[in-house]
Amino acid sequence: MPNYAIFRFEKHKTVGTIKAASLHMTRGRETQNADPDRKELNEILKGSTDPSADVKSMLNKIQKETGKPLRKNGVQAIELFFGMSPEWSKQATPEKLEHWKTITQQWAEQTFGENNLVSLQLHADETTPHLTGFMVPRDPDTGRLNASRWFDGRKALSALQTGYAASMEPLGLARGVKGSKATHQRVQRHYGNINKTLQLDPKIQAPIPPSIFTNKEEWAEKERLKAQKSALSVIQPLADKAARYVEEKKRADRAEEALSLARRKADSMRAIPLSDVLKTLGMELDPADKKQWRDPEHRFRITIDNYKFYDHSAQKGGGGAIDLLMHTTGQDYKGALSWLADRFGDETARHDMLLNDLYRSKIRINEAKQRPAFKQPEHKNEPKIREFLNSRGISFNNIPDSIRTDDRGNVAFLMYDDKDTLQGAELRGTSSGFKGLALGSSREAHFTGSINVKNDEKYDLYIAESAIDAISVVGFLSPEKIKAGVKLLSTSGVRTSLTKTLRKIVEKASSVHIAYDWDAVGQRAASLLVGAIKAAFPTKKVENWLPPKEQMIHGKDWNDLLMVKRGLKKTVAPKQTVKRKIRF
């Protein structure tokens, strides 16, 4: 039997019912099927400790912005419930449960709106863990409450069930049979069924014994026939119902098998052809090279190989329609997914999203398998390191241990992953312009440096394309800024998404500054990386950090400017505007 993804909802029109549901979420009232000793396992994923207050805050905001009162008898909030088959939760690893939580929250925010989802909590103190919370149905087009946008009609409700189940497919959770005659079950009724216990009918009376004038054998026979008739009237409908249930279960199992087979077939067929995406974007095959796609402005030169693409102009590639759109249009993940849904349909776009995740996972696995073992640079030739750094305008009193030299005399900036394990090195040639990664380096690791940062303190984070640029940034920070605590990070080339390491470091930062090159490629990547960080950390202060325009002409990155500042590189004179005389 397959394991199912469970999604339930309940509409609330009054403050009273919202508060009652909130008390259940926060365990403010007795919950029979909850274990008090496991209450500490519960977790707030979004919102405050008072979900009803989160709803009230959003409703007040809507009234203030629209200048109109809430409609009487209108739906003010939707209570959401996300669960799974008990069998799945019993076998799931902690990592799988974490993925389930993350994907569920992402799906809810993408489906109902990130700001509309005001509260979400994990209940782990019950037999089967589940998520519950509130969404306020604010229409993004009108700014007013409009639950019908998401919950109007059987088709819309079916789409919600299909959408949530699709997001759960990678975890092995499936949708129930589409078109089943089973009816929607309200959240409270779902809890009620969990808590329901068998109750005996107190009205059953024992038969009155016969009088002395009644033949006992005749009386017993009459009572037996009467009891048999009475029992049959109760048992026969139950037997018929049980038979129908068995037949329905067989039919459902057959339907699930057919659905599973159809999904397996669809997995090999339904990826959106990248050529169709490029055509929709207005690109055409180059007449001189039928393998390359070009746009009218000649910004892109793209070749495609099945599910993969490569842009020769930017020297960057990726996999799938979502990556392709993010690269060519500059949209973030959500924007690209919405674009695909508008033009190719919701189901197709959703499937491409799953393939995108699968593709990235396969790439990481293959890279890890094929990557040779990284050999740690053992040398620390300080004279050579100092000579190179001084030539770039950088000086240290003491060379950090994270800067070494390899067997070929290259300067190596050591890269660590999210577990502080050495996983690679960024290399710079001392006698040539060589730069790259050491053999076996992981793209999930980064070179980092810190100034006045303690383990438990916040810091300002500066992210650059190279270790040299990251260190150069310090030359443009005020003493007050440096004293407050600064962390530097290199992405070893442009990056438009978050690695585990980068996510961990960004999470602890009070502000993030993307200090990428100010050429076209660097700024396109900076814009995408800013968007990715804002999507992951909506309240985080993030900016694309650039020098004043008058300084940009002296180079294309922060080390160029540092070398100009240190007198190691000549300044570039600004272009003079020539005033022309107008002749009549």
Curated annotation (Swiss-Prot):
GO molecular function: DNA binding
Keywords of this entry: Plasmid
UniProt-listed GO biological process terms: DNA recombination
PROSITE patterns assigned to the protein according to its UniProt record, in alphabetical order: TOPRIM
InterPro entries attached to this UniProt entry: DUF3991, Mob_Pre, TOPRIM_dom
Domain Toprim: 459-548
Gene3D superfamilies in alphabetical order: 3.30.930.30, 3.40.1360.10
Name used for this protein in its record: 65 kDa protein
Species, as recorded: Zymomonas mobilis subsp. mobilis (strain ATCC 10988 / DSM 424 / LMG 404 / NCIMB 8938 / NRRL B-806 / ZM1)
